[in-house]
Structure formats: C-alpha cells, structure tokens
C-alpha cells in the first residue's frame, strides 16, 4: 500500500452532498423532512379543496403554515421567499397603517386577517419544490369536478337566471367563475408549453370553458380572453387565427341568456355598467377625502352612502368592483403604489423565468394567471376574494418553487443545514 501520496484524499473526504448535509444531524433532519413533506401535502390538498370549500382549504393552509414554521425552527433555517414577496409584505404593512386610521379600526383590523394568506408565497416556495406538476394536476382535476357540478346546476337544477347562477359548491358565483378563470389559464398554458401531461388538460378544458360561460360572469370572460390571448402571443401569433372559429362556436351553441349577457357588455344603458361608472366617481371622492390611508379596510360599504352621487344605481355596494380603485379608496394611494410595485416585480420575475427556458410552462401559466386577475380585476375586486387570491398566490409562486438552482449546501461549524433558498 502506498502511503506516500495522500493529496488525493481531501477531494473525496470533503465532498458534501445535500444528503450528507442532512445526515450529519439525523434527528433534526428527519423531523424537518417529515414536516416539509406533511406541509407540502397540505398545500397540494389546499389547492384542490379551494374548488369546493373555503373552510377546508383554510384549515389545510393552517396545517401547512404550522409545518412550515416548525420546520424553520427545528432546522434553524432562515426565512426565504421570492423577491416579489417584499412588496407584498410592504402592502400588508400599508394595510395595517390604513386600519389604524380607519373610522372603525376594530372592523378594519378584523378584516386584516386576510393578510395571513400572503404567507402562501414563502410556504409554497419552500415546501412544494418538486411537487409543482402534481399540484397543477390536482388543481385541474378538482376544477373539472367543480365544473361538472356547475354544468349540472345550470342544465338540471335550473341555475339559469342572473339571480341564481351556477356556483359549484362555493358560496358565490363570482368566486366560482374567478377560480375557473385561473384554472383555464393553467390548462391552456399546459397545452401550449408543457412537454408532457397535455392529455388531461385537453380533456378538462372544454368542461372548464363551458362552466365559466354558464356563470354569466362577464369579468371572468374578459379575464379568460386576456389570459388566452397572452398565451397565444407567447407561443405563436398564428394561433389567433382560431379565435373566429371559437367565437362562431360560442354564438352557435350558447344559450340565449348567455349571448344576451355577452352583448350587454357593449350596452351603454345596461344598469350594471352604469353603476360601475358611478362607483368610479364614489371611489374618486373617497380618495380625494383620504388620499393617504383611505377610508379603511372593509369600510367602503359602510361609508358608501357618504360619497354616493346621484348617478348611482345601487344605494350600497360592498366594494367598488375594481382592484386599483378599491385599494386606493380603501387603503390609500401609497398602498396602491406598493400594490403596483408588487405587480411589476412579479411580472418581471415571471418574464425572466419564461425567457430563461426553464419551467416555461409554469412561468407561462403564472403570467396568464396575472393577466387574468388584472383584467378581470378592472370590473371586480378579485384581489379581495380569499379563494381567488389563495389560488393566484399559489400559482404565481410555483415557477420560483420549481427552480432547483436556488438551493445550496450550507455548512456551519456548529451544525449543517438543509439547502436554503437565497432570493430574500
């Protein structure tokens, strides 16, 4: 045996892999991995449950957040999140400031509980990782079942009037259509950009499209059209040639009330259109009166009569049916600026990931979800709809969660940690 040349030994002794780092502290590593696995499963179940029950979905989210927080403590990991979480956190801070200056702080602070949903971003970022495609499949499958329920409600149970529309098992047709809108964006993105798993998306897409059409929710229709247009533009402009065919099929097969509802979007005498114009004026008055902090979270409905003009159709409205207008009136112009910062930061991140070529399907799906939310949000305050917001935050975080290049082995003198992300 030759003992004269040991110079090659360090290259094997000091090569540390991810599994080696976890094995150096086996009890903490096993506990942390168990929590990460449980939290990831809870998030997958949450994404599916959103299609059926907000209560079940939020219970699952609470379990996921508990697992995530416990894992950070046990494994002594630092908090990590995608870069776009910073403006989202700042928006939460601006909301709390607005609540403090509200005419009814108690009501406003109670409404601020929705800010907890923002933690979906770091939780999905850390816990989902290699399960991103599975999560998408779960969402598509559950949405297909929910869509079937909506079609049955319309065709058999006679949910075929504006006063009673298909809503699946959810509490409101606007939430139902908003979720379907986002899932349609995901399904079309998978068809156009995924290298595999296209079959299931192709099978469920017709049911999703029919269900969202039957809700008679015009804002969701606009969101779907905008999302699909973006995906066509990203893939191949020649795809726009099929749009006239789709339009012809729609008008040929859609029930009369659906086509009438579609045409009403262009009717200047439509009462809902007139009332939305009036809401813009109410919002402008609220902003002019309290530009810095707004009237306070969840206070638009209570203060609506104070700012209502003669052109208003409804005496009271729960919100202003427009994301930027609602945020500015409710939380102030600084909060709106921060929210726009979040949107820009998110879009830049997703465009960068799409251009890089890695996980193009997830990036395209997330971009389509953003466009759908923003365009539909010109006619509906969907950023304040908990179910829609939960699915939206989950989908837009998936490209970052799937980015394995963010992991690195971190070794310390006292302990060895699992790979950590370094975006924040």
Stretch-by-stretch model annotation:
Residues 1-106, 123-133, 137, 191-194, ...:
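Transmembrane signal-anchor hairpin modules in multi-pass inner-membrane enzymes, especially those
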Residues 3, 148, 232-272, 278-289, ...:
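A membrane-periplasm/extracellular boundary helix in multi-pass inner-membrane enzymes
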Residues 40, 63-69, 238-240, 245, ...:
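Transmembrane alpha-helices of multi-pass inner-membrane enzymes
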Residues 42, 47, 96-97, 131-162, ...:
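Alpha-helical transmembrane segments of multi-pass inner-membrane proteins
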Residues 55-71, 111-123, 175-184, 221-229, ...:
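Membrane-embedded alpha-helical segments of multi-pass membrane proteins
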Residues 100-109, 213-214, 378-383:
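Membrane-interface helix caps and helix-loop-helix hairpins in membrane proteins
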Residues 267-278, 293-331:
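Long extracytoplasmic/lumenal interhelical loops at the membrane interface
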Residues 331-371:
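Hydrophobic transmembrane alpha-helices and their immediate junctions
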């Amino acid at each position: 045996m030759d003992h004269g040349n040991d110079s090659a030994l360090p290259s094997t002794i000091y090569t540390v892999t991810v599994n080696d780092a976890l094995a150096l502290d086996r009890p903490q590593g096993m506990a942390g991995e168990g929590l990460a696995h449980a939290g990831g499963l809870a998030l997958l179940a949450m994404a599916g449950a959103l299609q059926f029950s907000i209560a079940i979905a939020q219970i699952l989210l609470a379990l996921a957040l508990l697992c995530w927080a416990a894992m950070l403590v046990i494994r002594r990991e630092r908090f990590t999140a995608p870069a776009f979480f910073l403006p989202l956190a700042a928006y939460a801070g601006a909301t709390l400031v607005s609540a403090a200056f509200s005419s009814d702080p108690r009501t406003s602070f109670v409404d601020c509980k929705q800010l907890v949903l923002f933690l979906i971003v770091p939780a999905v970022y850390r816990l989902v990782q290699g399960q991103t495609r599975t999560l998408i499949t779960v969402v598509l499958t559950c949405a297909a079942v929910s869509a079937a329920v909506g079609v049955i409600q319309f065709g058999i149970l006679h949910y075929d009037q504006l006063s009673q529309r298909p809503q699946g098992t959810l509490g409101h047709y606007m939430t139902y259509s908003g979720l379907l809108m986002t899932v349609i964006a995901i399904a079309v993105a998978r068809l156009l950009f995924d290298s595999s798993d296209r079959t299931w998306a192709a099978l469920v897409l017709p049911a999703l499209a029919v269900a969202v059409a039957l809700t008679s929710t015009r804002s969701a229709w606009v969101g779907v059209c905008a999302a699909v247009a973006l995906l066509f533009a990203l893939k191949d402009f020649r795809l726009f040639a099929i749009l006239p065919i789709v339009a012809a099929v729609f008008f040929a097969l859609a029930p009369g009330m659906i086509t009438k509802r579609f045409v009403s979007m262009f009717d200047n005498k439509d009462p809902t259109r007139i009332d939305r114009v009036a809401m813009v004026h109410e919002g402008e008055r609220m902003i002019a009166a309290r530009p810095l902090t707004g009237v306070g979270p969840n206070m638009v409905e209570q203060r609506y009569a104070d700012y209502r003009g003669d052109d208003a159709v409804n005496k009271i409205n729960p919100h202003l049916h427009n994301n930027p207008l609602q945020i500015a009136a409710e939380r102030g112009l600084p909060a709106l600026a921060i929210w726009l910062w979040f949107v820009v930061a998110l879009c830049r991140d997703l465009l960068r990931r799409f251009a890089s070529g890695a996980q193009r399907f997830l990036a395209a799906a997330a971009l389509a979800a953003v466009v759908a939310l923003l365009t539909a949000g010109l006619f509906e305050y969907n950023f304040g709809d908990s179910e829609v917001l939960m699915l939206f935050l989950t989908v837009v975080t998936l490209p970052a969660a799937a980015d394995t290049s963010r992991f690195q082995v971190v070794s310390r003198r006292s302990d060895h940690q699992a790979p950590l992300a370094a975006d924040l």
